[in-house]
Swiss-Prot record:
SUPFAM superfamilies: MFS general substrate transporter (SSF103473). Residues 29-51, 102-107, 163-172, 259-263, 317-323, 382-383 are extracellular. The chain crosses the membrane at residues 8-28, 52-72, 81-101, 108-128, 142-162, 173-193, 238-258, 264-284, 296-316, 324-344, 361-381, 384-404. GO terms for molecular function: transmembrane transporter activity. Keywords: Cell membrane, Membrane, Sugar transport, Transmembrane, Transmembrane helix, Transport. Its main location: membrane. Residues 1-7, 73-80, 129-141, 194-237, 285-295, 345-360, 405-425 are cytoplasmic. It holds the Pfam family MFS_1. It comes from Klebsiella pneumoniae. Belongs to the major facilitator superfamily. Sugar transporter (TC 2.A.1.1) family. CsbX subfamily. PANTHER family: RESISTANCE PROTEIN MDTM, PUTATIVE-RELATED-RELATED. This is D-arabinitol transporter.
Length: 425
């Protein structure tokens, strides 16, 4: 299969409109991220109940993320994206009308959970399109751009737009506006990705062989030690991102006196920073080595900036300027894990879809575990207990990285691994 090599700073131009579709769709999906937990609490539910809704959402997202890579290879990335697009729109409407509209907690969990199954099909299937349409030694920067447009959508526009719309049309009006963005993103993807190159060998498999390949997305975790360790590091990667979106609105708004709009703007600055850091770390990963960037900048950087995100606002109180410092730091270092997306398919070059499914599963599990940790620890240790737990896990990830061996294009095996890795005893 021929690959189009035209690019701009690592951005594959043949997939440009696909990247734009991701940004627009995730803008709509991101509207709720930084205020929904607070809004559910305002409907009369406890912080733990609000966090559990996100936990269930994350569990559904993890399941969907797990199958998305293989399904995208079997039925093509575009068809998988369209399934996710339709599911998202249908269950978003049901969530708003029957869940939030009637303050019915059971229906909130049901429809929000099912909707959580939808967005990974749209989002992560595009990674399969990237992997099969760019050279492997450019994969890190191409996926860096993927996470950059993801950040533009879910974080920057997804946070800034609600900060201006909520004072005028309220939370529910803002959530209805999200539907328009997701509809637009889905249509852009449908039109622009019709002619992308996708592998054909999976589409000719028998039904039994297709299920066997789908199962490989799970079996890789115990047949390939490097995949297992990389999965654990990827799960830890975004704990603070998903966890802080749940617990920090309550700290900033209810405890420190920030308005909802101010908090949303702080959160948007975090995501705005990741636009540039995703691209930067993707490129640096190709220059310095994938695992070196992940270990020394991702793990250590996130451990320190997660602590700062709690202690600096606690020390300075209602200071918008000081709150931006840890937000920017968090945005810089969370993106240093970007090279992991290139590590997974490099570890299983003959089963890239299954490897990407494990990567996607790990991202989804992070979405699930981050609020789950908050649900367990918040009643006993308050916000600081959750922050310390996340920090400790980043330190664990630092040590796990030392055992991951991967051949990186452009690096000798010795250069890429020997100095950073230790043999299991």
């Amino acid at each position: 299969m021929s690959i189009n090599n035209k690019q701009w700073l690592g951005l594959p131009l043949n997939l440009l409109w696909g990247y734009i579709a991701i940004a627009v769709f995730m803008t709509g999906d991101g509207f709720e991220l930084a205020f929904l937990s607070h809004y559910i609490k305002a409907l009369g539910f406890s912080p733990a109940e609000a966090s559990f809704a996100f936990t269930l959402y994350g569990l559904a997202a993890a399941l969907s993320a797990w199958i998305s890579g293989v399904v995208a290879e079997i039925i093509t990335p575009l068809k998988t994206m369209m399934i996710g697009f339709v599911l998202w729109c249908v269950f978003h409407v049901l969530f708003l009308v029957f869940g939030l509209g009637h303050a019915n907690y059971a229906l909130i969990l049901l429809f929000y959970g099912i909707r959580g199954f939808a967005y990974p099909l749209f989002l992560y299937s595009f990674i399969v399109a990237i992997v099969h349409n760019v050279k492997s030694d450019n994969a890190s920067s191409a996926i860096g751009w993927f996470w950059a447009v993801y950040s533009i959508g879910i974080g920057v526009f997804g946070s800034y737009i609600p900060s201006f719309t909520i004072p005028h049309i309220g939370e529910m009006g803002t959530l209805w506006l999200a539907l328009a963005f997701c509809l637009t993103g889905g249509v852009i993807a449908l039109v622009s990705l019709r002619h992308i190159q996708t592998p054909q060998h999976m589409q000719n498999l028998t039904t039994r062989e297709k299920f066997s390949e789908l199962g490989r997305a799970a079996t890789l975790l115990y047949t390939n030690r490097n995949i297992l360790l990389s999965s654990m590091v990827r799960i830890i990667n975004t704990l603070s991102l998903f966890g802080f979106a749940v617990i920090m609105p309550m700290m900033f708004v209810d405890e420190l006196g920030f308005s909802t709009s101010e908090w949303l703007q702080v959160w948007a600055v975090f995501f705005f920073t990741t636009i540039f850091s995703n691209v930067l770390w993707g490129i640096l990963g190709e220059k310095l080595g994938w695992m070196k960037v992940v270990r020394w900048f991702g793990c250590i950087g996130m451990a320190l900036s997660s602590l700062a995100f709690y202690y600096i606002p606690q020390h300075f109180g209602h200071s918008f300027a000081m709150a931006l410092i840890p937000a920017i730091a968090l945005g810089i270092f969370v993106a240093a894990f970007v090279p992991l997306a290139a590590v997974f398919p490099a570890l299983e070059p003959k089963h890239k879809g299954a490897a990407i499914s494990v990567y996607n599963l790990s991202a989804g599990m992070s979405n699930f575990l981050a609020p789950a940790i908050a649900v367990v620890l918040l009643p006993f240790f308050s916000t600081i207990g959750v922050v310390i737990a996340y920090t400790a896990l980043y330190v664990v990830a630092f040590f796990l990285c030392a055992f991951i061996r991967v051949e990186q294009p452009g690096f000798s095996h010795k250069e890429a691994t020997a100095r950073e890795q230790v043999e299991f005893s």
